[in-house]
Every structure is written in C-alpha cells, then in structure tokens.
Amino acid sequence: MTTMTSPATLPPGPTAPRAVQGAYALTQPLRGMRRLKDRYGDAFTVNVPIFGNAVVISSPAEIKQLFTSGPELVDNLEVNLGRVLGPRSMFALSGDEHKRQRKLLVPPFHGRRLAAYEKIVEEETARELASWPENRAFATLPSMMRITLNAILRAVFGAEGAEFAELRELLPPFVTLGSRLAVLPISKKGRFSPWRRFERMRREYDAIVDRLIAKARAEEKDDVLSMMLQTRYDDGSGLSREEISDQLLTLLTAGHETTATTLAWAVERLRRHPALLAELEEGDGKLLDATILEVQRTRPVIDLTARQVKQDGFRLGRWTLPKGYAVLVSIALIHDDDTVFPHAATFDPHRFEGARPDLYQWIPFGGGTRRCIGAAFATMEMTVVLRTLLRDFTLVPTSEPGERWHSRGVAYAPAKGGRAVVRRRTTIGGAS
C-alpha cells in the first residue's frame, strides 16, 4: 500500500547559501526578521544553522494551528537547548514522555504553593534593593539576576547551605555559557571547544545536586526538590536521578535569566514613560499587571519558539510542509504587528487593562503543550519585584533614547543593563 502525500508548497524566502543566511541571522537577528517579513510577507522560508530548513510564521491563525496540532504532526525541535540542559530536560523530550514529565512538574508552580513562594521573592527583593545607590545611574540587570537566582534556589532547595552557596557561584557563568552554546553551531570536538568547559561545569553541578538529593531524602522538607523525590508516575515509579538533575537545571536556568531580563526591560521602559510611572506609584495593581504584559509584548526576551514537522504533507494555513522542516514562530514579529496590536510600536499598558491577552497572539512564554510551565511563577516574581521597587523607591525619569537590544545568547537584554537612577522613599526598616 502506498501512502499519498501532498507536494510541498513553501512560502517564499531568501535563496542565499545556509552560511550566508546564518551570518545574517546572527548579526541582524531582530532587524533581519522584520526585513524578511517586509519583503516576503508573514510567512517565509529560511535555511540557517541550528534549525536547518525552516518556515518562519507570525500570523495568529497559523500560530494557533501550530500550537494546537498534536505531537504526531509537529513536536519538539531538537536543537542545542536540549544538549545544554540535558537529555531528560523538558526542552529535550517529545510526545508522551514530555507529557508525562510535564504532568509531574506543573503542580509545584501553581496554586497555594505559588503564594508561599511570594514571601521568598519579597525577602530577596528587599535584601537586594537595600544596597541600591541613590542619585547615580547603575545597571539593574545584575541586581535582577541575583534576586531571581536566589528566589528560584530557595524555592527549589529550601533553606540556604553550603550547596546553595556553591550553586549561587556556579550557575551565573554556567547559564551564560550555556545560553551562548544553545544558539551557536559550535562543535564539541577539539581541545579548546567551549563545550569542554561547559561539560566540566555540568559535572560540578551534578555533584552538588547529588549531595542535595541525599540530604532531601534524609529530611522532611517542603521545597520543589522534595516534591520531585516524592512524586510518582501513573505506574508508581519515581523520577530517576538523571531526570531530577536535568529538570532542576531547566527550572534554575529558565526560571532565572529570562525573568531578570524582563525586569531590567521594565525599568528601562518605565523611566521613559513618566506619566505611566506616576500612575503606578499610586499603587494600582491592575495597571501594574497590564504593564508587565506590555513589557513582555514590546520587549520579548526570547524571539523564537519552534516545532519540527513529524509527518510529510503537514498543512499549515496556506502551506504544505515536508517532514523534517522546522516551524519557527517569531514572537517579536507578531507582537509588533499593527493588525494584531493597534499602534504596536507604542508602549501602552492600558491596552491590557480589563482584558486578558489572547494566548495565540501574546506569546512571550511560547504556547500549546510546550508553553513555559513556570509562566505563573515568573509573573508572580515580576509583580512582587516591581511592586516592592515602586513602593520603596522613586524611579527618576529620563529623556535618553531607549536602550538597544543586546543578545546574551538565548535572551535579548537592554544593552546598558536597564540603567536606573533612584531615590529611596523609606529607610531600610520601612519607617518614613
């Protein structure tokens, strides 16, 4: 029996060799995407390192179709992020295995447990903000990195200890290197390959986690690691050591850098919108929620979410894609689309007041069955940090041009680190 498949019908795109397209993508990532959309429309075909042959889409209808298609049609795109975080990471798993793991990992980051983590975030924010200088410019991104790293470490491992301190020192350079390796086609071969250094750091991380697992088995605690050790699959089996180690690394990296970067962008945006800043200083919680949504829309720190076609003749809107092709959803392109978000270039949080965003249009956390499991935790973190910052400090507005986008590997950060000038409203103890 012969299975008939529809012939491929692909959107137009550049015809330059892969190396040339790759160089363009690396040197002009966001601007290049916009130019390609202007030339070819809201879907175009590219051939670039890491992804290979790929169709880039930014139409809400096609994005919705992609996100709601089953894993037999489109599933995980196995790129470097899985190599960086490990073969048992959520980023490396597909199909039923991904579904099984996701079911176990979602509960620690929702519901009543989220409320318990809020106190941790507030404590870490107050601790970091106590050292902020007044009346002189400084980059806020390093502070936001420390807040989010310490908060996720405490949520995952509980109380501080020797291992906590070791991870706090190891993870920042580990995450920075891994983030760059995830987007660069660098071979693992060779004495001087940066993968050698990364693998050495990974062994250090695994040794620390092994000690933490041994301690957690001997103690009754209420942190994420303890929950992972207690949780069971439907067949009664538990998570393996490798699964725990890879998933913890995923939580620690994904739950730290991207949130911190969004917070730095929030500071950068607020200082350039004094009228909005004045409204927020009155303590309007709903406007703060809308502001966080708008920061994520206008300054998404991750530009792409991806799938791979698993079946020949996959119909995606107007197109028919062959098996093996990647489908790349450009978050920046749909967020910048005036037909989706009127006056998209304008930073206006009021567009989200009293309205929940459409999750096939506003997609900073990705979408579908692979949407970030830590989205609720990240949103809570951003809310607590900004609420505390605006309560305890006056952010001094600026007329300087907006900071440029700077690639840190996976994430796009403000080029100057989200510079701020602040004045303290209260003393450390909270007295006027």
Model regions and ranges:
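Cytochrome P450 heme-thiolate monooxygenase catalytic core
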Residues: 2-10, 74-82, 97, 113-261
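N-terminal membrane-proximal hinge/A-helix region immediately C-terminal to the signal-anchor transmembrane segment
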Residues: 2-94, 100, 115, 119-127, ...
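Cytochrome P450 proximal C-terminal region
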Residues: 6, 10, 37-38, 125, ...
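Conserved cytochrome P450 K-helix E-x-x-R motif and the immediately C-terminal K′/meander segment
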Residues: 22-41, 284-317, 338
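Conserved cytochrome P450 K-helix/beta-meander segment immediately N-terminal to the heme-binding cysteine loop
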Residues: 72, 329-355
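Cytochrome P450 fold signature focused on the C-terminal beta-domain
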Residues: 221-222, 227, 279-285, 298-318, ...
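Cytochrome P450 catalytic-core helices
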Residues: 256-281, 376-391
